[in-house]
A protein has these predicted regions:
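Extracytoplasmic mature domains of secreted or surface-exposed proteins
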Residues: 1-454
Length: 454
């Protein structure tokens, strides 16, 4: 958890970073601009994943930026400043969804891959020097094909898995923010959690959470299968999707997502908890907490406060014809925290065009940094990047940019956020994409990294 500094200029772009707080891609050293994930380092450097230019199958790489935003060309050992993520599958389309720093100084990179007819998730583990750790998986790489999730021998699933937990992706319109959908998280003892969805023989979609050992092998001590299916007991739901995951210090795992009711006229979001053995934890308010009647809702992120184990969940929902950022706080036991918005979910519409929360970071004083994309969730001229600081009770912090939030808005393009994190000194780092109108549909014209003062 980050200790905030709350300076007088909090929420304004940091002029010491790149060009007055904004680094635009491509840059002379890097042809690509599709930024994907970001991680800050203790020495104030930044790891950034992006896809290079060149079309289908172009390399996916990790770059390391110095504190001032310049490329660290010593990274990777070949003078390029880049490390290519190789999964042993030529011409596969890859992305990077998460970068983790391991307790031994090494690194774990998680993403998705696709090469017809196969697709799935991958994990690549590196030593501290960014050489492959060949003790992990097969020579440093573990592939988890979607078709293998939920082995049909055990749970009667047909093995068919969806490639995205975002049902809106089928509309054909470009999403304004990159839905990470399947997520991964590493536990303190090295266990790795993956979430996604599977389809039953009856056609019902259900979320799934899998646990791997630190060497990449399946952990069969988790629910005796290596995975657990999200059932949402007591809810007559049609489908449920996983969108977020978080692990407590005691090894219990929280999974969040959305569901549609059986009558097709409603739904909402859920947070459910499994114990360290993969069983539904009924001490968590019966096992599952829901926010119902949140039409068109998503639960994009879950964070846990170290101090008291309380849980912050954020996403979005439709309210009065516009998308609203949605956030709620639960106690460690799964009850709504009365200290936040009087124990009710907080729906925020800070700009007229609506908004979504995609990421949040918890501060030591109880404040919450939240960031997302404005608009209706798709790449239109309404898409900008909004970042806010909320006080522990859910109200906006007026010391952050003078009104509690700030909007990143380039003149010629419209913007979407991909990822957000925070440096140890509280400065906020975000990466995302620039979009432009084309003859057929909005297209990606560039990428960016920005840094805000704390």
């Amino acid at each position: 958890m980050t200790q905030p500094t709350h300076t007088a200029t909090a929420g304004t772009l940091d002029p010491s970073f790149a060009d007055e707080g904004v680094l635009k891609f491509p840059i002379p050293e890097i042809s690509g601009f599709y930024t994907q994930a970001i991680l800050t380092l203790p020495n104030k450097q930044i790891l950034l994943s992006l896809e290079l230019s060149g079309g289908l199958g172009s390399p996916t790489v990790i770059a390391r930026l110095n504190e001032n935003g310049s490329l660290d060309t010593d990274f990777g050992g070949n003078g390029s400043g880049l490390v290519e993520i190789r999964i042993g599958m030529e011409d596969a389309r890859q992305d990077v969804r998460n970068i983790y720093r391991l307790s031994d100084g090494g690194w774990l990179v998680m993403g998705s891959y696709s090469k017809s007819p196969n697709s799935g998730l991958y994990l690549v583990r590196y030593r501290e020097d960014w050489q492959l750790d060949e003790s992990f998986g097969e020579k440093g790489v573990r592939l988890v094909p979607y078709a293998t999730m939920g082995n049909p021998r055990y749970v009667g699933l047909d093995g068919e898995a969806l490639e995205s937990s975002d049902e809106d992706s089928s509309t054909g319109a470009p999403r304004a923010s990159g839905n990470k959908g399947a997520t991964a998280l590493q536990q303190l003892n090295g266990k790795i959690f993956l979430t996604h969805v599977v389809t039953t023989k009856s056609g019902q979609i259900k979320g799934i959470v899998l646990r791997l050992n630190s060497d990449g092998s399946t952990d069969y001590t988790f629910n005796e299968l290596g995975f657990a299916i999200i059932e949402l007991e007591g809810i007559d739901y049609r489908h449920n999707f996983t969108e977020s995951v978080a692990v407590q210090m005691d090894g219990k795992v929280l999974v969040g997502g959305l569901f549609y009711l059986g009558d097709q006229n409603g739904g909402g979001v859920y947070v459910t908890r499994f114990d360290a053995m993969g069983r539904l934890d009924r001490s968590f308010n019966g096992g599952t907490v829901t926010v119902r009647n949140a039409i068109g809702s998503h639960l994009r992120t879950i964070e846990i406060r170290e101090a008291d184990g309380s849980i912050v969940a954020a996403g979005d929902a439709m309210r009065d014809g516009a998308r609203n950022g949605m956030m709620f706080v639960l106690t460690e036991g799964g009850f709504f925290d009365f200290n936040f918005n009087r124990g009710q979910p907080l729906f925020s519409r800070l700009v007229p065009q609506g908004m979504e929360w995609w990421r949040c970071v918890l501060l030591a004083d109880g404040s919450i940094i939240a960031s997302g994309t404005t608009g209706n969730g798709f790449a239109t001229e309404d898409a900008k990047v909004l970042t806010a600081r909320l006080l522990p009770d859910g109200s906006l912090d007026p010391t952050f940019n003078g009104n509690g939030f700030t909007v990143f808005d380039e003149e010629v393009t419209f913007e979407s956020m991909q990822d957000m994190t925070m440096m140890a000194d509280g400065r906020i780092i975000e990466c995302g994409l620039n979009w432009v109108e084309t003859d057929f549909a909005p297209g990606i014209a560039g990428g960016w990294v920005i840094r805000y003062l704390a």
